[in-house]
Amino acid sequence: MIYEDLDAAIVAAKDMCVVLETYVKITKCAKGYELFGTGEFVMEIKE
């Protein structure tokens, strides 16, 4: 799934961390941001 802004990607990543008990990497793609994508690394969410 592609998120248009970083804030939306962070919220989704935090939700995924809780549900799956894992770390989530956010990457930049042509149309916004992806979780576990193959683009440029932006940040890792651990919460």
Residue spans of the language-model regions?
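Short N-terminal "domain-start" leader segments
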Residues: V18-E47
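A short, charged, amphipathic alpha-helix used as a generic interaction element across diverse proteins
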Residues: I2-Y23
